[in-house]
A protein has these predicted regions:
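Conserved NTP-donor binding/palm subdomain of two-metal-ion nucleotidyltransferases/polymerases, i.e.
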Residues: 2-133, 139-413
Length: 413
C-alpha cells in the first residue's frame, strides 16, 4: 500500500510545493512561533495566498506577519486587516456569550467543559484572531435534558439532533450541547476510547482569555478530544489548516504531557499513529520544535496528509471537492476486510444516518427502505436545483484514493 500511496503523493505534490502555499504556511508559522520569514512581497501572487487562506479560514492569522512585512500591496493589507478586525470582534462577542451560557449552566449546578473553540484559542499568541465557530459544551448524559431546557428558557431554540450532541440556536449564536466528546467506531480500541472519555468531566482545568474564564478538559483528555474531532472530519470530507493550527498550539503547550503514559494511552485508543503524523506535519511545515516521539513518522504519509488538508480546505469548502465522502469512505475498516466495498460503506452510512437522524427506525427492515429513499430524494433535489449535480465516477475515485491514506492512519486499530 505504501507504494500506491507514494504515487498518490507524487501526483499531488505540486499543490504542496506551490509557492503561494509555502508562503501561507510561513505566515502562519510567524504568528504561531514567531518563525523568521524570507519572503519577497513583490514576487508573491497575493490573490492566490488570500484565496487559499480564506478557504481554510486562517486569513486573520496572517495579520501579524503581513503587518511586519514591507512591500505588501495596500489592498492586500486592508483585506487582511479588515478580516482580522471582523474576526476579533466576533470572537469577543462569542467569548462573552459563552461565559453567559456557562453561568446559566453553573446556576443549574451542571458540570461542563468547553470543547474546541476557546479551549484551543487561548493557546494562540493572539486568541482573538482564531476564526470562531459554534460554542461546543460537554455535559454528562444525565444532565443533557436539563442543560438544553436551561438554554431554551433563555431563548434558544432546538435546531437539530445528532448522535453526539443537540444543537440550539438563538440569533447568530449556535450552541452544540454534547452528550459525548465524539462518536467512536465499534472496534475494540474504539470502545476503549469511548469508555475512557466517558470520564472526561472528572478531568477539568480552567483557562481564560482576556480574564474571561471557562472550564475545559485537561491533559490527555484534551489531546484525545482534539484528535477525535479531527479524525471524525478527516474520515469524511477532511480537515483544513485551521484545525491543524489548533493541533500545533495544543501539542506545543502540552509538550510535557506527551510522556510514556500518555503515548501508551494513545496507542491503546488507536490514535497514536494519527497523532504522530499530524505532529510531524506541524514540525515540518509550521515550525513546531521537534518532538522525540514523532521520529518514526513516515515522511510520505506526512506529505500525503498535508496534500489532503490543502485540497480539503475548511469544513464549508469541502463538499464540492469531495461529494458524498461520508457515504463512500470507510476510514476505520472495523470489519477487518482490508479491501474497500462501496456496498458495505453505504450500509455503514445508512446505519449511521438512521442512528443520528431517525432514532425511531431501530428495526433493520428500515435499512432497505431508506437505502432507496435517500438516493431518490437526492435525485429529486438535483432536478429541482437544490443540489448540485455530481460526477459519481469522480466522487468514487476520490473517495477510494483518500481511503488508502485514511487506512494508513490506523484509526482505532
Amino acid at each position: 500500500m505504501h507504494s500506491v500511496l507514494q504515487k498518490n503523493v507524487e501526483r499531488k505534490m505540486s499543490s504542496t510545493e506551490k509557492k503561494e502555499t509555502n508562503i501561507l504556511l510561513a505566515l502562519l508559522a510567524y504568528e504561531i512561533f514567531d518563525q523568521a520569514m524570507n519572503i519577497d512581497a513583490s514576487t508573491v501572487d497575493w490573490s492566490a495566498v488570500l484565496a487559499e487562506a480564506q478557504c481554510h479560514k486562517v486569513t486573520a492569522l496572517m495579520y501579524p506577519a503581513i503587518r511586519s512585512m514591507d512591500g505588501v500591496p495596500e489592498a492586500v493589507f486592508n483585506k487582511v486587516c479588515g478580516t482580522a478586525i471582523a474576526v476579533a470582534t466576533a470572537s469577543e462577542a462569542m467569548l462573552k456569550e459563552q461565559r453567559r451560557i456557562l453561568d446559566l449552566l453553573e446556576a443549574h449546578q451542571i458540570p461542563c467543559a468547553v470543547l474546541k473553540g476557546t479551549s484551543v484559542a487561548y493557546l494562540y499568541p493572539h486568541p482573538e484572531l482564531r476564526t470562531i465557530g459554534d460554542i461546543d459544551i460537554l455535559v454528562d448524559e444525565e444532565n443533557l435534558d436539563e442543560a438544553c431546557k436551561a438554554l431554551q428558557a433563555d431563548g434558544f431554540a432546538p435546531s437539530y439532533t445528532a448522535e453526539k450532541h443537540l444543537c440550539l440556536q438563538k440569533g447568530a449564536v449556535w450552541v452544540e450541547m454534547h452528550r459525548m466528546v465524539s462518536v467512536f467506531p465499534e472496534s475494540e480500541k474504539g470502545r476503549f476510547t469511548k469508555q475512557t472519555m466517558a470520564d472526561a468531566l472528572h478531568h477539568i482545568q480552567t483557562a481564560e482569555i482576556d480574564s474571561v474564564r471557562f472550564p475545559m478538559l485537561s491533559g490527555a483528555y484534551q489531546i484525545i478530544a482534539l484528535l477525535a474531532h479531527m479524525e471524525q472530519h478527516l474520515a469524511t470530507s477532511g480537515i483544513g489548516l485551521r484545525q491543524v493550527c489548533d493541533w500545533v498550539v495544543t501539542v506545543d503547550a502540552l509538550r510535557d504531557c506527551f510522556d510514556g503514559e500518555t503515548l501508551a494511552l494513545l496507542e491503546r485508543c488507536g490514535l497514536l499513529q494519527f497523532a504522530k503524523i499530524m505532529t510531524r506535519l506541524c514540525e515540518k511545515y509550521l515550525g513546531l520544535p521537534p518532538c522525540s516521539w514523532t521520529a518514526d513518522a513516515s515522511d510520505a504519509l506526512v506529505d500525503a496528509m498535508l496534500s489532503d488538508v490543502l485540497e480539503g480546505g475548511n469544513f464549508q469548502a469541502q463538499y464540492a471537492k469531495r461529494p458524498l465522502a461520508d457515504v463512500l469512505t470507510d476510514a476505520y475498516d472495523v470489519a477487518g476486510k482490508g479491501k474497500t466495498s462501496l456496498f458495505r460503506n453505504y450500509i455503514r452510512y445508512l446505519k449511521k444516518y438512521l442512528r443520528q437522524n431517525e432514532p425511531w427506525a431501530k428495526s433493520r427492515l428500515w435499512l432497505p427502505v431508506f437505502g432507496v429513499f435517500l438516493p431518490v430524494r437526492w435525485g429529486v433535489r438535483v432536478l429541482l436545483g437544490k443540489r448540485k449535480q455530481i460526477n459519481l465516477v469522480h466522487a468514487v475515485g476520490t473517495a477510494r484514493e483518500r481511503e488508502k491514506l485514511l487506512r494508513e492512519m490506523k484509526l482505532y486499530q
